[in-house]
Amino acid sequence: PGYIKGYPPGVRENGGQYTHAGLWMAMAMARKGDGERAVQLLRMLNPIEHARDAESVWHYGVEPYVMAADVYRLPGRIGQGGWSWYTGAASWMYRAWVEEVLGLQVRNGRMLLNPVIPVTWQGFSLSYRHGETVYAIQVENPDGCERGVVWVEMDGQRVTGDVISLERGLVKHRVVVRMG
């Protein structure tokens, strides 16, 4: 039923890699606390993984710097990308990495920091700009946890919970997040 029936088996939503669904799966893994699996899936979906050498790029058949909507499983075309430039998957990839894995969520003038990362990551840093205000964020993971925030500091002061009220002004804040 529907348009999927028009695709041969192994093409697009009919048994191939449907990138939107793969990204939503990665987001679900992060939300359940499985940072290892979330990052594994995101790396699999990354188009650059199809461009490790000239032969791979040629076989992939679409731009390796653009998210493809799908990757075929059709015999004779296995691993070829399709529908690049026509997909909203890039925005989902961005949200999956930033909001779900790195844990930076901005809502209603507040910034929530709740990373879900592989246990092998000792931490990471990122910068977030809100108007003219810059938040230099350092996440520390000394115990090798996949999730869980022990404390958050902004400019050397502990923050209650893991939420920071955003402000506007020509200022730079240093934020430290300790996982554990």
PLM segments and residue spans:
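Glycine-rich phosphate/pyrophosphate-binding loop
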Residues: P1-Y3
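Non-catalytic C-terminal accessory modules of carbohydrate-active enzymes
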Residues: G6-Q17, L23-G180
